[in-house]
Amino acid sequence: QGFEGSLPAGDILNQIYSLPEVDKLTNIVFMGQGEPMDNLDNVLRATEILTADYGWAWSPKRITVSSVGVKNKLKRFLEESECHVAISMHDPIPSERAELMPAERGMGIEQVVELLKNYDFSHQRRLSFEYIVFKGVNDSMQHAKAIIKLVKGLDCRFNLIRFHQIPDIPLQGVNDEKMEQFRDYLTQHGVFTTIRASRGQD
């Protein structure tokens, strides 16, 4: 359907308030509906209301905002918000990431990581990286070693995500054994890594 416009803060909040399960919510994630940093003013306003005493009075640690890394905007978010941060990496090698994600050409993953190293993620705020594992694309030992080198010194975690086949898309996911091997290698080399529970296979 493509991009149609950015939601104002009120509409972002209404997406939450209108959920039938709103009273049972424990966490909120800004992910999968466009790039939050491209609508930063409204995202910051919405998270401010969610965490303010006059709003929901939630702790910022119950909210995660995802980003591919947008120059200047990510820095502003890190300075003005205490919410958790999830960075969509998907490939640690810049030239390959640019093929998967054109945003790499704007603010590369190496620049993103260098920026993140200026902030403290050892206490309440958590930093995570999202990584969809594609067969024969980003699942090799070369990629695992590049991840370890790239995030060295960062207090972070990695979430490996299974890819489910999409019609007419040539990309493929890997089997469970490969996912576990990739996870174990990263974990053994100091990068805390989990495999996200899959809800999309059906």
Spans of features found by a protein language model:
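Canonical Radical SAM [4Fe-4S] cluster-binding loop centered on the CxxxCxxC motif
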Residues: Q1-G10
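Conserved AdoMet/S-adenosylmethionine-binding subsite of the radical SAM
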Residues: D11-H189, T194
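Radical SAM enzyme core and accessory elements
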Residues: G200-D202
